[in-house]
């Protein structure tokens, strides 16, 4: 499972690094989480997690503060979550998570990304059953048994603990995120995470090769350019010539 997660992260890093609208995407999500759950990160654990994630992605503090202040003021737009799924280039499985204030616009934009890359958008449940909604933590280490013991003593419902090339990866149900993180940091307050998030981990991989590689890149770029798209998850392993 760890390798699949790492492959997805590598594939997404190239598009994430090219995001010109990353600040607005974070601002929108922080605003909605604060509006729905409260503006105090100590009381709103989802907000705390999102702020930590934004800071890790180098989102400036003023962007975060502005979104929270906007939520505290009670004014502003109402965004609702929307999820679309289907098959991308090469038959890979794709989940697209959005925040929107206009469902018609969003589905039109997302469907356009699928149709212009010979991909197929499906209905709810088309591919999501082939992903596990997981809390994922990775950090330097080589003793997975000791980590598992710490988590079990904290009564964490662990899915899996892996160790590969000096990196330990912990998988747990997404509902166990804070419990897992607290157990790990209480055991080692100096612990620094390479990965620390709630994500969708694919159960299988789809290798994308040949002409499908360029189409896949176009598909990812088009989705990243959609204002309403927040996250894209896929199970593609892209094999590029010369790599």
From Swiss-Prot:
Keyword Lyase applies: no
Keyword Transcription regulation among UniProt keywords: yes
GO molecular function: DNA binding
One GO cellular component term: cytosol
Compartment list: Cytoplasm
Gene Ontology biological process: regulation of DNA-templated transcription
Matches recorded under PANTHER family: TRANSLATIONAL ACTIVATOR OF CYTOCHROME C OXIDASE 1 (PTHR12532:SF0)
Protein name (database record): Probable transcriptional regulatory protein Patl_0550
Organism: Pseudoalteromonas atlantica (strain T6c / ATCC BAA-1087)
